[in-house]
Amino acid sequence: MTRTALVVGDGGVVGHRLASYLAATGAWRVIGIGRRPQGPPGVTHLALDMLDRDALLGRPQAVAGVTHAFLTAKAPAADAAAEAELNARLLHNMIDMLEAGAAGLQHVALVHGTKWYGCHAGPYAVPAREDDPRGPAPLFYFDQHDALAARQRGRAWGWSTLRPHTVWGYSRGTGNNLVTLIGVYAALLREAGEKLAFPGTPQNYEKQSQATTADLLGQALAWAATAPSCRNQDLNLTNGATFRWRDLWPAVAAFFGMEPAGPAPEPLTQLMPRYEPLWPRIQRKYGLAEGHLEELVNWQYGQGLFSVAWDDGSSNDKARRLGFAAQEDNRTALLRILGALRRDHIVP
């Protein structure tokens, strides 16, 4: 039986990969929602604003036949409290639309992350487990999770949430993307004739880190949404093993034909404005895709990730126990995604 997926946020790193993966299987009809005019190939894309409840309820036919809904989008706001309120409203709007038009709804899935455990606020217990205490509030994960559980009570459909960490993948026009940032950063330093210094702090260079590829996350989202054992469950999902940037960085440098170096002396937001004028020249020199640098990278986002001084780690035991055994080798995955960026003329 063909399932029908609704992917809200099909233009983002996670949503784009999930929608593409589902469409490629041939077993799913995929409807994508986002603000961009187009979605991934094979996806019926709708340019809708998920915060406009009246407009959504005016189009119940848009989600007719949807059996599985995946919320991969996030609405940004000025502060954490406002962001929590906004994203809870986004979830309620999605469920209202589904209840109006998707009579056969079976499952609603959310993508959250290890901020659930407070990884952004300071040292936390590692490896983190799904039943560990919540980190500091406000955080929109908590508001969405509580709202989802409340909306599901007494309904035939179930839910799941996945908690990845630092998703590796890419989507055009998304600045909050670590692998694209690394690629652009390396291209700029190479054009300047410099070594590839690590773009973070000495502590971040040495600490235990983890990541989740968008490919792996897409597979896990589809699995959790269709496995009876995952009904109403929260699941950590990372590549598997942890890593240290000091061990991966030489491979990144080799990919770009550069000599690796240790941590840079300045944070990205101070360092990179001096190099940004080189980007148009790099685009012309290597025939890269057109577009402004700010559409590819957000130095503040990268600086935040590369400044964390404490260990990160999540236990994937629950997902494995319930049946998801796939994992990724961190070095192989990072180089594969950089290769895809090069293939698509995003970085040289």
Which role does the model predict for each range below?
Residues 217-302, 315-317, 321, 338-345:
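Mid/C-terminal beta-alpha module of Rossmann-like enzyme folds, strongest
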Residues 67-71, 82, 89-140:
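Conserved Rossmann-fold NAD(P)-dependent oxidoreductase catalytic core, especially the SDR/UDP-sugar
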Residues 38-39, 47-93:
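NAD(P)H-binding glycine-rich loop region in Rossmannoid oxidoreductase-like domains
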Residues 8, 33, 72, 108-114, ...:
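SDR active-site strand-loop-helix element
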Residues 27-37:
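Conserved glycine-rich Rossmann-like NAD(P)H-binding loop of the short-chain dehydrogenase/reductase
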Residues 177-181, 200-225, 232-233:
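Substrate-positioning beta->alpha
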Residues 147-176:
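Conserved beta-loop-beta element that borders a ligand/cofactor-binding pocket
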Residues 3-25:
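N-terminal Rossmann NAD(P)H-binding glycine-rich loop of SDR-like oxidoreductase domains
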